[in-house]
């Protein structure tokens, strides 16, 4: 009886799996797809073993007796009287020969039933298993499915917009110099609706009061941080301007020397996605004026400039498509270029990741700061804000017109804010801070890093002398002198190994700046209609403490990946991992970075604006941005601007006619022929025309997946459930047939 008890115990333990082998409480990590597949497979095995025991161990009696599920003749396996005390078979010569026919012959209908059920069930299960394995095989080695919005969004499947197949699109737009408090119902109505989560466009929206940039809060360091996930001290672009002593070369905007850009072991997002999916999905990235994306590494490899201890630079380090910087480009042309990428007519040529850079607000801010309503340049400033807002609105409308929003995610960010500087009142002159002889004897290079000064010395042994001379020459309430390696810990800027770092830095408080005499003269000659009788005027700058109010940046995510709600402020080093996640890049294929996972954790539980508690200097924010700033309304408790308060400033009247034309333009009018590195037909087909695009992905299926179709994960789960039900139904049917026959 011991063996029978053991088998019954096992049967009881597995019993629950028979009803629902895929129940949710069996999966403990709902965000780990690899664990999910493993758990699903484990459930399937348990379910199969459970039912196989039932198939092979139904109650049997010898000879012509009938089986009974609760009768006294219920037996399992070898008859117990054939075993000795140790469980070993005994001599069967004394046993009736008819009894030995148990389960071995076909003279009884009952054994035939058992054998048929076992073989047929096993066959069906084997077919199902092969199907499951083929379907479950991901496009890439390890899949990531951690979307937080629509359960129908899957980065690995193809969608259909009604005319063409698409892989999911991810578009990143960076608004240089755009502070989140610039958003208002009056000046940026579209961004206002996004920021308040009230945009009625059928897309989920996630936002945050502000995103924290990296120090120094300058354009090139922060744009490289956004796409690498690394602090500037780690990725090596430590400022907009610096000296590279190894190359004996100065870096500044416009320098495209690959030896500087590839100096550290960094990997921008376009390299990550193009490498991770190489050979599986024809994943391509396109960048439009993104800082650092137009570096040509071909010459670097051909001339063997790469150090011997490093491998040649991968071709994926350059985006498949990239556009060089053009400061004079109108926003209508920028929109046209982005839509050209979207409108490419085949999967093989269309990029799945597009990054665009919008410099307009930053360019204005450097000239005049952020003018308040009573200041001279306010109307010009609001016009600039309105143009940027309209650009974003028409970009989203272009996606909607093309029926792309159910599988397109848009990420809107900025790199930093802006601080107003009253000139010359709040400026100190570099030449007045250090004796001319000391500058000549000790200083090799002195660069203006925005409002800061970075000083490289000829001999590190002179650091203390120069440091103390500077400290005695400045107002330490407004300016702080730092020796490299002694920056505040929260800046994440201490690393003695980075050779791009200057020896000594002078960092002002927001609203103050260090300038050279020559620079001050140049600035004073600019167009400053706000200059008073004392020749005092306002400019703007950035580069300060990244936690300063003036330096805050924007983050808004919209699309099927995102949930609806707010998240707490976070560091911009999280954006790289966010983009990897949206695109479906597994963690093992991501480059090492400084992201903490904080953003991903928050996306799991978005909050309301009331739940995101913000303690802030709202008096200062009102004085700088006005009480009707959307930020002040949401988190400062200030009243909404009423129609009476609001001067009619409808941005539709300010729309660029060309931009309107492009947004409404059918994609058939946007065709492009580009030089490709692979054999791809030219884009002469129009997106809305009659075409028969072929599938070129590594998935064997050419079936068009509609934009509202279930994801691969949901589809597979349905197949598993259906197969399980099918097997159960077949077995029950066989039971009924055999029972009726007997």
From Swiss-Prot:
It holds the Pfam family Phosphodiest. Its main location: membrane. Its EC number is 3.1.4.1, 3.6.1.9. Residues 168-545 are annotated as: Phosphodiesterase. GO terms for molecular function: nucleoside triphosphate diphosphatase activity; phosphodiesterase I activity; ribonucleoside triphosphate phosphatase activity. Residues 640-670, 686-711 are annotated as: Disordered. InterPro entries: Alkaline_phosphatase_core_sf, Phosphodiest/P_Trfase. Residues 1-113 are cytoplasmic. The keyword Glycoprotein applies. PANTHER family: BIS(5'-ADENOSYL)-TRIPHOSPHATASE, ECTONUCLEOTIDE PYROPHOSPHATASE/PHOSPHODIESTERASE. Present with 3420 molecules/cell in log phase SD medium. One of its GO terms (biological process) is cellular response to phosphate starvation. It catalyses: Hydrolytically removes 5'-nucleotides successively from the 3'-hydroxy termini of 3'-hydroxy-terminated oligonucleotides; a ribonucleoside 5'-triphosphate + H2O = a ribonucleoside 5'-phosphate + diphosphate + H(+); a 2'-deoxyribonucleoside 5'-triphosphate + H2O = a 2'-deoxyribonucleoside 5'-phosphate + diphosphate + H(+). The keyword Nuclease does not apply. It is found in: Membrane. This is Ectonucleotide pyrophosphatase/phosphodiesterase 1. Belongs to the nucleotide pyrophosphatase/phosphodiesterase family. Residues 640-659 have a biased composition (Acidic residues). It comes from Saccharomyces cerevisiae (strain ATCC 204508 / S288c).
């Amino acid at each position: 009886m011991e063996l029978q008890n053991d088998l019954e115990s096992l049967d009881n333990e597995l019993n629950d799996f028979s009803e629902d082998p895929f129940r949710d409480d069996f999966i403990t990590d709902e965000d780990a797809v690899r664990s999910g597949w493993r758990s699903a497979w484990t459930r399937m095995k348990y379910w199969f073993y459970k039912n196989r025991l039932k198939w092979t161990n139904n109650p049997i009696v010898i000879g012509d007796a009938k089986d009974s599920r609760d009768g006294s003749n219920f037996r399992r396996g070898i008859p117990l009287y054939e075993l000795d005390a140790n469980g070993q078979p005994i001599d069967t010569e004394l046993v009736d020969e008819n009894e030995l026919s148990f389960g071995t012959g076909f003279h009884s209908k009952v054994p035939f039933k058992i054998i048929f059920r076992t073989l047929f069930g096993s066959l069906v299960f084997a077919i199902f298993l092969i199907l499951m394995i083929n379907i479950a095989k991901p496009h890439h080695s390890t899949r990531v499915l951690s979307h937080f919005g629509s359960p129908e969004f899957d980065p690995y499947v193809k969608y259909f917009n009604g005319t063409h197949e698409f892989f999911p699109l991810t578009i990143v737009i960076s608004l240089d110099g755009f502070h989140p408090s610039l958003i208002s119902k009056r000046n940026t109505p579209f961004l206002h609706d996004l920021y308040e989560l009230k945009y009625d466009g059928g897309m989920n929206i996630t936002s945050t009061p502000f995103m924290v940039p990296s120090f120094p809060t300058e354009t090139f360091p922060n744009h490289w941080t956004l796409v690498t996930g690394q602090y500037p001290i780690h990725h090596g672009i430590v400022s907009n301007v610096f000296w590279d002593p190894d190359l004996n070369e100065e870096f500044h905007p416009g320098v495209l020397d690959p030896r500087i850009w590839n100096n550290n072991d960094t990997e921008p997002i376009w390299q990550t996605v193009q490498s991770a999916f190489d050979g599986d999905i024809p994943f391509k990235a396109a960048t439009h004026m993104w800082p650092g994306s137009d570096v040509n590494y071909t010459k670097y490899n051909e001339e063997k400039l790469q150090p011997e201890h490093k491998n040649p630079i991968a071709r994926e380090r350059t985006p498949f498509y990239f556009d060089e910087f053009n400061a004079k480009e109108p926003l209508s042309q920028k929109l046209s270029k982005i839509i050209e990428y979207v409108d490419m007519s085949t999967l093989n040529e269309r990029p799945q990741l597009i990054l665009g850079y919008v410099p307009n607000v930053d360019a204005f801010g450097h000239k005049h700061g952020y003018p308040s309503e009573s200041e001279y340049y306010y109307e010009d400033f609001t016009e600039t804000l309105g143009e940027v807002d309209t650009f974003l609105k028409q970009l989203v409308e272009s996606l909607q017109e093309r029926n792309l929003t159910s599988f397109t995610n848009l990420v809107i960010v900025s790199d930093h804010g802006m601080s107003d500087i009253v000139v010359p009142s709040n400026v100190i002159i570099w030449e007045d801070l250090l004796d001319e002889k000391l500058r000549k004897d000790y200083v090799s290079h002195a660069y203006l890093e925005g409002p800061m000064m970075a000083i490289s010395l000829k001999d590190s042994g002179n650091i203390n002398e120069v440091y103390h001379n500077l400290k005695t020459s400045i107002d330490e309430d407004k300016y702080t002198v730092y020796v490299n390696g002694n920056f505040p810990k929260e800046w994440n800027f201490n690393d003695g190994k980075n050779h791009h770092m200057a020896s000594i830095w002078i960092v002002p408080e927001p609203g103050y700046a260090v300038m050279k005499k020559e620079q001050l003269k140049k600035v004073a000659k600019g167009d400053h209609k706000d200059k008073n009788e004392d020749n005092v005027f306002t400019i703007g700058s950035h580069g300060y403490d990244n936690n300063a109010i003036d330096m805050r940046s924007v983050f808004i995510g919209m699309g099927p990946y995102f949930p609806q709600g707010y998240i707490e402020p976070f560091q911009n080093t999280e954006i790289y991992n966010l983009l990897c996640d949206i695109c479906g890049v597994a963690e093992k294929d991501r480059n090492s970075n400084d992201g903490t996972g904080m953003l991903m954790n928050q996306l799991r539980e978005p909050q309301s604006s009331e739940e995101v508690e913000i303690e802030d200097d709202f008096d200062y924010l009102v004085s700088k941005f006005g009480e009707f700033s959307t930020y002040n309304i949401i988190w400062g408790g200030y009243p909404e601007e009423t129609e009476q308060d609001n001067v009619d400033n409808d941005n539709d009247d300010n729309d660029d006619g060309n931009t309107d034309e492009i947004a409404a333009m059918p994609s058939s009018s946007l065709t492009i022929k580009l030089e490709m590195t692979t054999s791809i037909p030219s884009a002469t087909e129009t997106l809305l025309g009659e075409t028969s695009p072929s599938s070129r992905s590594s998935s064997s299926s050419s079936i068009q997946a509609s934009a509202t179709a279930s994801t691969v994960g949901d589809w597979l789960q349905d197949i598993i459930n259906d197969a399980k039900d099918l097997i159960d139904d077949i077995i029950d049917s066989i039971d009924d047939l055999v029972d009726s026959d007997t």
